């Protein structure tokens, strides 16, 4: 044990859906913790990532994308995203530099002003040439003159090291909250459910992924060090079941195989995965499911 001075800082990553929040968190902690898919609104709850760099422990909060919510679940997701802003020491507002600032982006910027928050703006996806980048920079310098701007590529890691040095410079002397090799404080059951939900998002079409959730009912470490996982895919309508199962169960078997591969990569042990489908009408309006999803 050393007597080095310990520093900590909590960092919230907020922005529109598919702006690169989850990719950035995964890049910083060096592990695929937060699920990533081409579909918007993949992240539903706050995903906590932890990285310890020498004397500094950084606690990162990946949040659901900010959009115009309609249903009860969507509204809960947006509330969840903003809730992390209040408690964080530093706010990173990530912006997709390949797109112009739209109404939702302007609403986010206005909300920062209302909350008296000075965010750090991350202009993401600079690995691809953008005709909007300079205009976004110019606009932000006028509307948020106190904020720093970091052009980055979360996917390739460009300028992420510069960002990390800045984050470390803002950390305060305080005992670490976690062990230096921890990457998250999330329960393993929750992480396992997220991994399977990612495969459902990647392998089911149109709106169906948004109509389901996944719960890990059993997470058991066996004597041979392997893990047995029982999960329930909860859907709101009976007719969704046939789509998820596929012909002769082929679809759910394929999803199970892909999910098991990802689970084994994350937990570094063999995994025995068993998937079940359960109909629970109006689960999106049930607070018990929100508690499980941590929103």
From Swiss-Prot:
Residues 124-127 are annotated as: G4. It is a peripheral membrane protein. Residues 152-154 are annotated as: G5. Residues 7-176 form the Era-type G domain. SUPFAM superfamilies: P-loop containing nucleoside triphosphate hydrolases, Prokaryotic type KH domain (KH-domain type II). It is found in: Cytoplasm; Cell inner membrane. Residues 62-65 are annotated as: G3. GO terms for molecular function: GTP binding; GTPase activity; ribosomal small subunit binding; small ribosomal subunit rRNA binding. Residues 204-281 form the KH type-2 domain. Residues 15-22 are annotated as: G1. InterPro entries: G_ERA_dom, GTP-bd, GTPase_Era-like, KH_dom-like_a/b, KH_dom_type_2, KH_sf_prok-type, P-loop_NTPase, Small_GTP-bd. CDD domains: Era, KH-II_Era. It comes from the Bacteria. GTP binds at residues 15-22, 62-66, 124-127. GO terms for cellular component: cytosol; plasma membrane. Residues 41-45 are annotated as: G2. GO terms for biological process: ribosomal small subunit assembly. Keywords: Cell inner membrane, Cell membrane, Cytoplasm, GTP-binding, Membrane, Nucleotide-binding, Ribosome biogenesis, RNA-binding, rRNA-binding. Its main location: cytoplasm. An essential GTPase that binds both GDP and GTP, with rapid nucleotide exchange. Plays a role in 16S rRNA processing and 30S ribosomal subunit biogenesis and possibly also in cell cycle regulation and energy metabolism. NCBIfam families: era, PRK00089.1, small_GTP. PANTHER family: GTPASE ERA, GTPASE ERA, MITOCHONDRIAL. Belongs to the TRAFAC class TrmE-Era-EngA-EngB-Septin-like GTPase superfamily. Era GTPase family. Monomer. This is GTPase Era. It comes from Rickettsia prowazekii (strain Madrid E).
């Amino acid at each position: 044990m050393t007597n080095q001075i310990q520093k900590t800082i909590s960092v919230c990553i907020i922005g529109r859906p598919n702006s690169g929040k989850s990719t950035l968190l995964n890049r910083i902690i060096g592990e695929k913790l937060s699920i990533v898919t081409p579909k918007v609104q993949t992240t539903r709850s706050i995903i906590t990532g932890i990285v310890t760099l020498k004397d500094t422990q950084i606690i990162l909060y990946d949040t659901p994308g900010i959009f115009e919510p309609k249903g009860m679940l969507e509204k809960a997701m947006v509330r969840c995203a903003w809730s992390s802003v209040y408690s964080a020491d530093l706010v990173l507002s990530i912006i997709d530099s390949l797109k112009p600032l739209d109404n939702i982006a302007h609403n986010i910027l206005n909300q920062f002003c209302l909350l008296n928050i000075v965010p750090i703006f991350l202009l993401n996806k600079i690995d691809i040439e953008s005709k909007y980048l300079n205009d976004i920079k110019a606009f932000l310098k006028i509307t948020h003159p106190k904020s720093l701007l970091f052009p980055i590529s979360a996917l390739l890691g460009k300028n992420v090291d510069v960002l990390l040095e800045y984050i470390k410079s803002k950390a305060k002397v305080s005992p670490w909250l976690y062990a230096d090799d921890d990457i998250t404080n999330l329960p393993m059951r929750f992480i396992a459910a997220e991994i399977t939900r990612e495969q459902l998002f990647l392998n089911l079409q149109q709106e169906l992924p948004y109509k389901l959730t996944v719960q890990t009912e059993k997470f058991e470490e066996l004597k041979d060090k392997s893990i047995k996982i029982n999960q329930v895919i909860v859907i709101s309508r009976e007719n969704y079941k046939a789509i998820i199962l596929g012909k002769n169960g082929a679809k759910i078997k394929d999803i199970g195989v892909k999910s098991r591969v990802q689970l084994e990569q994350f937990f570094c042990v063999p995994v025995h995965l068993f998937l079940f489908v359960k109909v629970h009408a109006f689960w999106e309006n049930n607070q018990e499911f929100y508690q499980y999803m941590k929103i």
